[in-house]
């Protein structure tokens, strides 16, 4: 099963793709979709949508794991991230890819056993778990891989609980 992890953002969308085969989880790809601050909002969202569709077509994920929008202090940031999530969800719906959402602390628990683990600790763990030579950069891509990893573990647990394995 191929899992696409997404760290949604307005300026930077983190992308992380892993492959789950039996008990093995391997790295496929990580990167970002970036939009310049000087572009009008509608053009930024269009770019996110079009570039994300290219990722979906290139890698054909079976499922998508996305970070839930959580409380943020900056309302403008929250609105931008919400708009970006909207175009990402639209692209996923068009491709009939199921979406699973995870809160940041759920992702941290799945990678460290602790919901308040540091970003550095999570990055080190994702590097180690996926046998990467270095921490994925930028942070948004590392976060997306962590979200995908979380989903791989959660979906495995659901299958075991429901007697599918």
Swiss-Prot record:
It is found in: Cytoplasm. Its EC number is 3.1.21.10. Its main location: cytoplasm. Binds 2 Mg(2+) ion per subunit. It catalyses: Endonucleolytic cleavage at a junction such as a reciprocal single-stranded crossover between two homologous DNA duplexes (Holliday junction). Mg(2+) 1 binds at residues 7, 140. It holds the Pfam family RuvC. The active site is at residues 7, 67, 140. One of its GO terms (molecular function) is crossover junction DNA endonuclease activity. CDD domains: RuvC (cd16962). It is an enzyme of class 3 (hydrolase). Its cofactor is Mg(2+). Keywords: Cytoplasm, DNA damage, DNA recombination, DNA repair, DNA-binding, Endonuclease, Hydrolase, Magnesium, Metal-binding, Nuclease. InterPro entries: RNaseH-like_sf (IPR012337), RNaseH_sf (IPR036397), X-over_junc_endoDNase_Mg_BS (IPR020563), X-over_junc_endoDNase_RuvC (IPR002176). One of its GO terms (biological process) is DNA repair. The keyword Endoplasmic reticulum does not apply. The keyword Heme does not apply. Mg(2+) 2 binds at residue 67. NCBIfam families: PRK00039.2-1 (NF000711), ruvC (TIGR00228). Homodimer which binds Holliday junction (HJ) DNA. The HJ becomes 2-fold symmetrical on binding to RuvC with unstacked arms; it has a different conformation from HJ DNA in complex with RuvA. In the full resolvosome a probable DNA-RuvA(4)-RuvB(12)-RuvC(2) complex forms which resolves the HJ. PANTHER family: CROSSOVER JUNCTION ENDODEOXYRIBONUCLEASE RUVC. HAMAP family: RuvC (MF_00034). The RuvA-RuvB-RuvC complex processes Holliday junction (HJ) DNA during genetic recombination and DNA repair. Endonuclease that resolves HJ intermediates. Cleaves cruciform DNA by making single-stranded nicks across the HJ at symmetrical positions within the homologous arms, yielding a 5'-phosphate and a 3'-hydroxyl group; requires a central core of homology in the junction. The consensus cleavage sequence is 5'-(A/T)TT(C/G)-3'. Cleavage occurs on the 3'-side of the TT dinucleotide at the point of strand exchange. Belongs to the RuvC family. This is Crossover junction endodeoxyribonuclease RuvC.
């Amino acid at each position: 099963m191929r899992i696409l992890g997404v760290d949604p953002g307005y300026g930077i969308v983190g992308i992380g793709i892993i492959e789950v085969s039996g008990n093995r989880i391997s790295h496929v790809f990580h990167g970002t979709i970036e939009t310049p601050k000087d572009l009008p909002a509608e053009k930024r969202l269009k770019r996110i949508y079009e570039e994300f569709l290219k990722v979906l077509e290139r890698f054909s994920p079976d499922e998508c794991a996305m970070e839930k929008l959580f409380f943020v202090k900056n309302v403008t940031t929250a609105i931008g991230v919400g708009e970006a999530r909207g175009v990402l969800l639209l692209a996923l719906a068009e491709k009939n890819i199921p979406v699973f959402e995870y809160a940041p602390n759920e992702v941290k628990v799945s990678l460290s056993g602790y919901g308040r683990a540091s970003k550095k600790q999570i990055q080190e763990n994702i590097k180690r778990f996926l046998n990467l030579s270095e921490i994925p950069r930028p942070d948004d891509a590392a976060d997306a891989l962590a979200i995908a990893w979380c989903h791989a573990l959660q979906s495995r647990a659901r299958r075991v609980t429901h007697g599918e394995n």
